């Protein structure tokens, strides 16, 4: 069975982090902190890296399911002038915005490194290099498309991601009128 375990995440200019590295335990990780300290940001960065896995599928995973870095995810730096007579406002987006990953991938626990990056405003998320998962995923897709049971050994990973944003959606509330 092919395993995918993220060992290390490195964030460069991603949301509130200028340059931060997180080493993850293969069994379980707990992020605890005050509101706004970056707990969700680390999980969203892991989701961007899972997007690299999903992006490797060309046939069976629509691109709308691939989570990318957005322009709004780029760290903002306040403009500050050395001259006290000059008033500055606003922020400047800090590019490049990059998420790097070291992970175990495959049946032989091979270590892979890859990164996803956005280089300028309104640009698309790119791979910094090639996607090391793509050859394996292409082989899986070919086996599945044959429909001759040659895919019997393929065990696809289950990927589940629930964002905290789901807590704030009002779409499922039904208005009831009494009286």
Residue ranges and their predicted role:
Residues 1-179:
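P-loop NTPase switch/coupling surface
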